[in-house]
């Protein structure tokens, strides 16, 4: 009897927790099939989400959440709003997802998550299709360090930054070749940052500031002699 009472108290605590001011209302549905394979790729540019260590717990974000790609890589804790949809919500369940795609075609002006089906089924009944939710942005946890994927050609470098912990996203970034000073980069699309410079053959360092306000200098993250299309892992990671 004592164990049952403790379980009931835990459920009640979960039900009232969303009343805190750091929870925001929204809606969620799902896409990508039962195995989530249809969520690979997307407007953040991550490609295969397993290769980039994001996995199946991902979501496409509506226009205000996506913020023209500035929110790519951010993490969100989501629960189904049981008080509004008791027949369709799974009581006491929560899931953390990473924003990896743009889903602006759904409720474009409102907070909306188009989640992978496996992630969505943690919180909602499949037949519901769409449910009211409560969400909050949370710290991202990643295995290993930040990774840089170098694409582009000649005098155009396009750098995809992946596996970023902390706030999960970037507010500013610059690059320095072994023969240059620091060059400011700009967001091209999603999590891809660009610069127009001839850096081929040079070792590359990156100065990255997260949306949480933390700056890390990745000295010689890319060794001299690199080629376009290569991925480079680091030992550094963001805390916020």
UniProtKB/Swiss-Prot annotation:
Keywords: Cell wall, Cell wall biogenesis/degradation, Glycoprotein, Membrane, Secreted, Signal. One of its GO terms (biological process) is plant-type cell wall loosening. It is found in: Secreted, Cell wall; Membrane. Residues 41-145 form the Expansin-like EG45 domain. The keyword Phosphoprotein does not apply. May cause loosening and extension of plant cell walls by disrupting non-covalent bonding between cellulose microfibrils and matrix glucans. No enzymatic activity has been found. May be required for rapid internodal elongation in deepwater rice during submergence. This is Expansin-A20. It comes from Oryza sativa subsp. japonica. The gene is EXPA20.
